[in-house]
Amino acid sequence: MTITPPKIPWQVTGNHWLTVPCIHPADASIHLIGALHAQSRAAIEFAGGPEFLDGREAALARLVVVVNDAPIELGAGGINWERESGWLPTFSAKAGDLLIRGTIVAPHGRNADVAGIVISVSVENRGESSVELIIGLTGTLGHRQMRVRTARAFADGHSAFKGSDHSVVLEGKSAESPLALAIGGEGEFSSEVVDGQSPGWTLDRKLSLGAGETHEAAFHIAAGPERDGAAAVLGVMRRRGSRALISSTKSALREMEPGTGNASVDRLIARHLFFAYFCSIARALDDAHVYVARSRVPWNGQGITIRDWHALMWVLPAVQLADQSLARELLLRVCELHGYAPGNGVHYVDGSLFEPGFSLEGAASYAIAVDAYIVQTSDDKVVEEPVLADSLYGSHDDMEVRKHATLPLYSTEVNPDGSVPARPFTAHGNAVVALALDVLRHTLDEKTAEKVQDSAAVRAALMRQFTIQSDASRAMLASQSDLAGATALEDEPSASMYWLPFYELLNRDDSLYRRTVKRIESAETPELVVRCAQLVGPNGAQAFEWLRRAPLDNGFAAETVDQDGRAVGNGGDAAMSGLIAYLLWYSSHALGLKV
């Protein structure tokens, strides 16, 4: 399923509890808030209206500024945006003599990891006389939906009512509604609710703002699986205070930022890394466990589903760069939920099967991911975890079933992205398997390790069976084979021949490798994953520069792009942003690519 990216360049933020993907760049209004609900195996999302992606509906929450009884349209005279650490959107706008600054933060870090959003605003009066100011937050609940890949609207109607301490609670009218939002300010605010099919609400306060004075206001939006839980989280956010929550978040993000020594590259890595970290990984509101999805952003057609390959080879490596504790939890969680049938297809977030289809790379990814995790973190004790050991044994068994009767080569049903190869034996798949076998031989118990196929034999057989042209000076590798004489040269985007050095089949300077990829260098492809693969190819520096300049989907990954790098389909690809973040870091540190 492919979705065209929205025309509005939405600002995006969030934490593991909530995603805030639709912050309007024109006025900083919030049009959608989403959370993961494990029991539903889906995202639950609140919006101002069903056409929220087009920006034509009322906002779920927007700032209210009234000066001397005259409403101010925030952003009417222009609005400037910056993103701290590549993730925290901050804005500033002028309205007459007033300078309005704001930050929208989903708290993260020590004593800040809550299911909520902080909207912090300051209003500075740069005029020569005092003004009567109303500052507040208002919004409309006009749409609620559950989404795996396609959205389904809730039919029970929307409810808004005044809570305790001048707060407002938004929820569904049914007692089974799986999400509630509690909204309140710090300090004294009045609250109003307007009933209706799409109920409206307002929090505001009045004050006099003298010349040269600055007034600060903070609003909290808290979430829970029902109204009482949301109200409790709101109470905690008020108690901890917006300044502490924002400060803790900024500190946590600074500690997580990887460094390459190049400031522009570091900013690019941080942007992709934090997008993957917060929009591919979620903690469900109803059980607080961690889950991984392709993307929590509503304009990505892969939605709240995931393949083992993407979880372990795209998302996990990026997380390891920033948060080794979460990386360990994520690795074990994937093994727990998905390891019962490694590489068996697309999964819902809870591990149940969404779409069957065996991927050789998906099965092999468990061993490679474990080894990469240990190398990155030095946590070799992780192999003692029973759930991880079970997954490794299971992945080995599933790969062995696919082994050719007489040759040490392995077949696959689908490529890593689910596409079907023209021939069942692929060069990419067997290169990945060979690397996995290297890991399994020193990870499994001694008796089982003796039965593990020698990876050198796999690589040797691959080179013999996939090399075409008898003349060594013109030899190259086929991408696929049936091992009976029929081969295919077409490069599969998700199983590109560019990756072969990455999986230690050939050196990136090897003449055979260079001839193999030369035939595909001139091919135009809309698949962004191929641009990623080119980073490890002979012209990695050019690919690095292209990725640095590509606009993508407002700076984040998209599954398909045009030749200039603008998103065409399935933007907001959080898992692929994880791949980009890791590859940019890897290219700088391991390959020495510079821009």
Model features per residue range: what roles?
Residues 236-297:
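An acidic-aromatic substrate-binding cleft motif
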Residues 212, 216-235, 300, 346-365, ...:
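The feature captures the catalytic groove of carbohydrate-active enzymes
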Residues 394-405, 411-412, 422-431, 449-527:
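Extended ligand-binding clefts on enzyme/binding-domain cores
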Residues 125, 302-405, 430, 572-594:
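Aromatic-rich carbohydrate-recognition surfaces in CAZymes
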Residues 271-275, 333, 372, 391-402, ...:
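Alpha-helical scaffold segments in carbohydrate-active enzymes
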Residues 258-266, 318-331, 374-393, 442-456, ...:
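Structural helix-adjacent loops and short alpha-helical linkers that scaffold large soluble proteins
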